[in-house]
């Protein structure tokens, strides 16, 4: 059992925010270089992450959202996936957080739930991403912003196939509590996934009252 699991249902854990805004303010082209800055400017990434710890985050989320090979392929860097992943983990670990979480974002590939080949490809992408990040010093994986329930299921299956670390699964939802672009309530999405992930969450731009309603409904799923 990872140490972070001992805190589930006992402590309120705060995850660090994405550092893309800070890096952009410092002149980094986050649309093109967000993953590569781990290799090129580790000190810049380290300083941005340390700011999150100073703000009180117990869980530091590594700068690895775009680590899937299909995403790196757009920049012709898929063959450096492991190098980029390990650089990001190293920089985050050097900040000495209470807990280190590695984020994996969507593959960006088309996914046909009715096609075994399509599903297998997606699962393989997520498995390779988790394998590149490794388990050493990593307390959990954050699967963030996947494109609907099927994509999230593929991500969970892929990570589970190579790691026993806890999984945090987070959806993007609208003001009505629906998974963006998929016409399904967050609570229903979680119910479909059942016990696939250890922790479920969501990102929303909704007002606090609506967000609280979504949270309560999801907690009952």
Regions of interest found by a model, annotated:
Residues 1-221:
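Domain-level signal for soluble alpha/beta catalytic cores
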């Amino acid at each position: 059992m990872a140490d972070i699991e001992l805190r589930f249902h006992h402590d309120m854990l705060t995850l660090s925010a994405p550092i893309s805004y800070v890096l952009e303010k410092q002149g980094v082209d986050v649309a093109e270089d967000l993953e590569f800055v781990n290799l090129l400017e580790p000190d810049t990434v380290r300083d941005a992450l340390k700011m999150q710890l100073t703000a009180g985050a117990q869980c530091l989320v590594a700068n690895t959202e775009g680590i899937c090979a299909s995403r790196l392929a757009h920049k012709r860097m898929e063959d450096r996936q492991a190098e980029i992943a390990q650089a990001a983990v190293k920089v985050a670990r050097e900040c000495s957080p209470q807990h280190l979480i590695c984020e994996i974002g969507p593959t960006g590939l088309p996914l046909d739930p009715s096609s075994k080949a399509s599903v297998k490809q997606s699962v393989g992408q997520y498995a390779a991403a988790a394998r590149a990040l490794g388990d050493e010093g990593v307390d959990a994986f954050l699967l963030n912003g996947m494109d609907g329930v099927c994509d999230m299921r593929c991500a969970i299956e892929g990570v589970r196939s190579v790691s026993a670390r806890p999984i945090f699964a987070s959806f993007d939802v609208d003001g009505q509590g629906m998974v963006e672009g998929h016409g399904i309530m967050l609570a229903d999405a979680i119910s479909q996934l059942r016990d696939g992930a250890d922790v479920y969450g969501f990102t929303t731009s909704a007002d606090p009252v609506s967000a609280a309603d979504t949270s309560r409904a999801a907690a009952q799923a």
